[in-house]
Each structure stands twice: as structure tokens, then as C-alpha cells.
Amino acid sequence: MTTGLLQGKKGLITGIANNMSISWAIAQLAKKHGAELWFTYQSEVLEKRVKPLAEEIGCNFISELDVTNQKSISNLFNDIKEKWNSFDFLLHGMAFANKNELKGRYVETSLENFHNSLHISCYSLLELSRSAETLMHNGGSIVTLTYYGAEKVIPNYNIMGVAKAALEASVKYLANDMGENNIRVNAISAGPIKTLASSAISDFSTMLKSHAATAPLKRNITQEDVGGAAVYLFSELSKGVTGEIHYVDCGYNIIGSSKLL
């Protein structure tokens, strides 16, 4: 039985690509806890995947969103203002890197990929937060998704590690800026999980095996694990929490060495 932690709240969910997306898992649990949701999709191709998911859980609002296009962002928030007037939480769930550079050496990263990765994976949080702030009339919660590769070198993660490091720093600065309006900003650092995005990382299966073997709980995380953490951060249970990187990784981040040498 759900407890209705988000009953009466409205939330914008970005980053859904298909039914394997972490954003989708978060949306499902948020809906179960009583939230009214608004989905976005990145392109017409993804619209065909996202619309059926929205219909599945009774999400009545869905919009195209290209975070590299200021007009697209403005159109979205104008629509939200018209339909909802205000809302309570935002999930920033998008990230991007050229999959051809998610292997080999980081030093080979192209300027174009560096720019695009930082823009879509990090700067978009700033832009969406700035727009959301004007519509979070009673305070609110902004949550983004990060990964341990922001802190430590993970083979093949490359430019995404740098983008996630910038994202985590942005969380702290945004939390400081927006706290005066009772808007909290946090990140969930999830362990590796099979998604459309992670499939682009070279040798991802090895990453999964290593994580499960090393983590104290001796398993990989599930989408539901991340969904539960997000609902907590969206809800009033976390009303005193902001600027935090919340780990959902079965304890992997606490380990210094997986075995004695």
C-alpha cells in the first residue's frame, strides 16, 4: 500500500527514453505516491516510445523538449504555467555523450563532444532550474542523476565523468542560490544499471559485474531502488536536505579496495 508521499504535488519528469530509463522508474513510483506528472521527450522518434508510457500511468501532459534550444525550453514552461500555474518538483534526467568517445582515452575527446556533453548533461540543469524557480511558488525540489565516475576514474566513462563532476558542482551552487525560495536541489548518484544510455558505454557488462562483486550488498541496484530515493527527495520527508549527492549504489562508494593485497 502506498503512503501518498506526493499526494497533491505536481512534477515535471525529463529524460525518459524508453521503459528501461531510470526516469521512467522514478515516474512510476512518483505516480503511485499520488503525484500528477508532466513528461517530456527529446525528439519525434522518442515521442513514439514515451507517449505510450505516459498513457500507461495516466499522465495527461507530454511535451517535446530540446535543451539545446531556448525556445523549446520557453515553450515548455509557458505551457506548464498555463495548465498548472505552479508545480512542486523537477527531475532532470538527461545526459549525452558521443558513444564513439565512451571508450579508449579521455585525452582524445573532441571539442564538439566536450561542448555538447557539458551543455546537455550539465548546463541544461541550470537552464531548467532557472525556469522552474519562477513556477515553484511554494518552494520545491529539483533532483538530477549522477554517477560515481564524477569522483573517480571509471574505464571508458571519459567525458561523461567530467560532465557529471560539473553537474555535481552545479547542484551545490544551485542549492545555495535557490534555498532562499525554499527550493531544494539534490543529486542521486546511482550505481550502474542497464539503460539505453548505459548501453553506449564500452564494456558496460564488466562494470556491472565489478560493481556487484565489490559493493557491500553484493548486488547491482534496481530501477526501483533509485525511484524510492527520488520520491524521498521530492517529498516533505527531505525538507531539510539540499545540495547533497545521495548515493544509491549498494554501498559501492564506501569501498577503498575490494580485497587485501
Swiss-Prot record:
GO molecular function: enoyl-[acyl-carrier-protein] reductase (NADH) activity; identical protein binding
UniProt keyword list: Fatty acid biosynthesis, Fatty acid metabolism, Lipid biosynthesis, Lipid metabolism, NAD, Oxidoreductase
Family annotation (Pfam families): adh_short_C2
Record keyword Repeat present: no
Active-site residues annotated for this sequence: 147, 157
Reaction(s) this enzyme catalyzes, per UniProt: a 2,3-saturated acyl-[ACP] + NAD(+) = a (2E)-enoyl-[ACP] + NADH + H(+)
Pathway connected to this protein: Lipid metabolism; fatty acid biosynthesis
Amino-acid positions noted as binding substrate in the UniProt annotation, renumbered to this chain: 97
Residues that, per the record, bind NAD(+): 15, 21-22, 42, 66-67, 94, 164, 193-197
Enzyme superclass (EC): oxidoreductase
BP-aspect Gene Ontology terms: fatty acid elongation
EC number(s) given by UniProt: 1.3.1.9
Family to which this protein belongs: Belongs to the short-chain dehydrogenases/reductases (SDR) family. FabI subfamily.
Its job: Catalyzes the reduction of a carbon-carbon double bond in an enoyl moiety that is covalently linked to an acyl carrier protein (ACP). Involved in the elongation cycle of fatty acid which are used in the lipid metabolism.
Quaternary structure (record): Homotetramer.
Protein name as catalogued: Enoyl-[acyl-carrier-protein] reductase [NADH] FabI
Protein's organism: Rickettsia prowazekii (strain Madrid E)
Lineage: Bacteria, Pseudomonadati, Pseudomonadota, Alphaproteobacteria, Rickettsiales
Designated gene of the protein: fabI
